[in-house]
Amino acid sequence: YGRRRHPKKLTPLAYKQFIPNVAEKTLGASGRYEGKITRNSERFKELTPNYNPDIIFKDEENTVMNHWPGVKLRVTEGWDEDGHHFEESLHYEGRAVDITTSDRDKSKYGTLSRLAVEAGF
């Protein structure tokens, strides 16, 4: 506690690779499904909106902007209610997020995935 971790070489994730290496809706990855959150539910009030055009992470050494100057994190899907995901999707609870980079350069996605894991997502 209180000690900085030594920087380590970041290895990009492969396409369709998960950390932990289990499907997103398993207990090991995300805990139990707690139920879909709708706009009319009490739990909807617990969701925190973020209208900031820049997403900032508390991460002294490996942010998207440090890794790729001028590139921003682009959130394509967060909490959702449209019914386009599987029935117990974590998007319906506000516990899943789909991300890309502002330049939409797919060659960055493996490293972006690794940065998300290192940031605690």
Curated annotation (Swiss-Prot):
GO terms for molecular function: calcium ion binding; patched binding; peptidase activity. Keywords: Autocatalytic cleavage, Calcium, Cell membrane, Developmental protein, Hydrolase, Lipoprotein, Membrane, Metal-binding, Palmitate, Protease, Secreted, Zinc. Ca(2+) 1 binds at residues 60-61, 76-77. Pfam families: HH_signal. It is found in: Secreted; Cell membrane. The keyword Metal-binding applies. SUPFAM superfamilies: Hedgehog/DD-peptidase. Ca(2+) 2 binds at residues 61, 77, 80, 82. Zn(2+) binds at residues 91, 98. GO terms for biological process: animal organ development; cell development; cell fate specification; cell-cell signaling; central nervous system development; neuron differentiation; proteolysis; regulation of gene expression. This is Sonic hedgehog protein. It comes from Devario aequipinnatus.
